[in-house]
Amino acid sequence: MARRVVVTGMSVVTALGSDVPEFWDKLCAGKSGVSRLERFDCSDFKVNFGGEVKDFRPEDHFDGKEAKRLDRFSQFALAGAQKAVRQSGIDFAAEPDPYRCGVIIGSGIGGLNEIEEQHAKLFDRGPSRVSPFMIPKLMVNAASGNISVFWKLKGPSSAVANACASASNAIGDAFRLIQHNVADVMITGGSEAAITPMGLSGFARMGALSTRNDSPESASRPFDRDRDGFVLAEGAGVVVLEEYEHAKRRGAEILAEVLGYGMSSDGSHMTAPDP
């Protein structure tokens, strides 16, 4: 018999706020986190706005050495995981079997910031100046791996790279691992940090982004007749999934229950919906 799966912790790192109640209140009030980008000069770009996380300070979550070994997308993911685990109240050190606790984090692109930084070093200063941490920072599974290491979890640890569906896909996979008795607790969700010169110009060249530079706050309008593209943003969303009886035994507050999950593909085009 399939086991029940519940949510016992959740967190967000977004342009609209990095606290779940604050984020939800602003969302319900119709507020936008989209504004002109500030991390780099994009005055010559076709698009100069996005959903930028402007209040995130790595030093609030990691020491200097640790932060330098994490790409921005992994920083978002680990910071989000810390908050979600804190809300769940779970003590991984007290769990009897660390092989029953795991992580799946989705990311469509991974460490794009690191790729751009090291690419510049390669051509400006030569191959000997490329960081030895480049590969472990840019890998899509860097977020999951670093979360596993942080809590010394020895259960399933993997990543999902499935474009815009990466986080939902990751949560669904984690749900199934618990449902089918492979794990008892999973940290799961998604993280993205593709607001970089290359990321912004690449999506703009695809014709995928809205170009409403004069009204960025109202540019995201996916169901509007006059929509002209999506808005590039960054951030993370992380939840703690837990087997129902496991959560009940430790007296955890149950926030929600995951009842099912499915996947499909139109098999038509990489970016356009099936006409």
Q: Model features per residue range: what roles?
A:
Residues 167:
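Short conserved active-site loop signatures built around small residues
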Residues 4-8, 35, 214-275:
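Condensing-enzyme catalytic core mediating Claisen C-C bond formation in acyl metabolism
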Residues 42-52, 110-114, 193-220, 262-275:
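Active-site-adjacent elements of ketosynthase-type condensing enzymes
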